[in-house]
Amino acid sequence: MKVAVLGAGAWGTALAGHLAARHDTLLWARDAALIAGLQARHENSRYLDGIALPDALRYDADLGAALAHGAADDALCVIAAPVAGLRTLCHAMRDAGCVPAHVVWVCKGFEADTHLLPHQVIAAELPEQHSNGVLSGPSFAREVGQSLPVALTVASTSAECRERTLAAFHHGAMRIYTGDDVVGVEVGGAVKNVLAIATGIADGLGLGLNARAALITRGLAEMSRLGVALGGRAETFTGLTGLGDLILTATGDLSRNRTVGLQLAAGRTLNDILGALGHVAEGVRCAQAVLAIARAQSIEMPITEAVCGVLFDGIAPRDAVSGLLRRDARAE
């Protein structure tokens, strides 16, 4: 199978390396210098340093060439751009006059200004594209790059997209499950990043494992309420792309969103934290969108509200936690 991966960040690079072990894979990035480095060293020293990439993996800064590769009869196009760059990439794909027939994306979050999920952006920008879906689940790019075991879910209303994604990814240490709840999978992937900031704050304040467990459990309730209101199915949120992804992101030391929370608890400013990270922390980008959507739907999301207060309203992390503890008692 031919596979084109659009986006050479940490996740796109790790997935491309996995795919190249079995398929004719091409990794695209618009940054010619990044592509030149990949070609010379077979390592993404900028985003995934220390991970050797397969010799068979090919690289290109020409979007047209990448799209042509992913548009072959027996091919798949994987969009690994962040949500913030998804619409721009769709524009470029359309302008190139070559939209692959089968597309799966791996980005997580809501578009900041429109509050749209990725599948809604795809539908608006590539209306002729119908065989598409989302690949998501509990996964750190570095561990995938190291060929450690991982389980992901592809959700699509297209059986052909599900089957093609399964054929591309389900090998080696990667197990793929299939489903059709695109909304539920996308909401889980977006909200868990915000909740991971909350658990990072609690851990950074030394509040203990009991507090972490409470935040994860009550955070899952927030995620599920929002997801069901937007059209997802409740059972999706107890699966890999809901609870599974939340546990990993809220507790794993490789989690950028958890790191943001830890550093906020240590008294660092958000600007300093993001500057030092050097990578995207999607929870920061989409926290306000999640809260705005919840309020528009009249859905109570107190943990998300507390995170937004710390990130954007100058509320001290300890005061935000105290506010959660002062909430009225209620039935679970």
Curated annotation (Swiss-Prot):
Cellular localization per UniProt: Cytoplasm
Record: residues binding sn-glycerol 3-phosphate: K108, G137, S139, K192, D245, S255, R256, N257
UniProt keyword annotations, A-Z: Cytoplasm, Lipid biosynthesis, Lipid metabolism, NAD, NADP, Nucleotide-binding, Oxidoreductase, Phospholipid biosynthesis, Phospholipid metabolism
Assigned EC number: 1.1.1.94
Domain of life: Bacteria
Residues noted as binding NADPH in the record, renumbered to the chain: W11, R30, K108, A141, R256, V280, E282
A biological process from GO: carbohydrate metabolic process
Keyword DNA-binding: no
A GO-annotated cellular component: cytosol
Location of the active site: K192
Catalytic activity: sn-glycerol 3-phosphate + NAD(+) = dihydroxyacetone phosphate + NADH + H(+); sn-glycerol 3-phosphate + NADP(+) = dihydroxyacetone phosphate + NADPH + H(+)
Classification via InterPro entries: 6-PGluconate_DH-like_C_sf, 6PGD_dom2, G3P_DH_NAD-dep, G3P_DH_NAD-dep_C, G3P_DH_NAD-dep_N, NAD(P)-bd_dom_sf
Pathway stated in the Swiss-Prot or TrEMBL entry: Membrane lipid metabolism; glycerophospholipid metabolism
Pfam families xref list: NAD_Gly3P_dh_C, NAD_Gly3P_dh_N
UniProt cross-references to SUPFAM superfamilies, sorted A to Z: 6-phosphogluconate dehydrogenase C-terminal domain-like, NAD(P)-binding Rossmann-fold domains
Catalytic class of the enzyme: oxidoreductase
GO-annotated molecular function: glycerol-3-phosphate dehydrogenase [NAD(P)+] activity; NAD binding
Record's keyword annotation contains Metal-binding: no
Function in brief: Catalyzes the reduction of the glycolytic intermediate dihydroxyacetone phosphate (DHAP) to sn-glycerol 3-phosphate (G3P), the key precursor for phospholipid synthesis.
Annotated family: Belongs to the NAD-dependent glycerol-3-phosphate dehydrogenase family.
Protein name, entry field: Glycerol-3-phosphate dehydrogenase [NAD(P)+]
Organism: Burkholderia lata (strain ATCC 17760 / DSM 23089 / LMG 22485 / NCIMB 9086 / R18194 / 383)
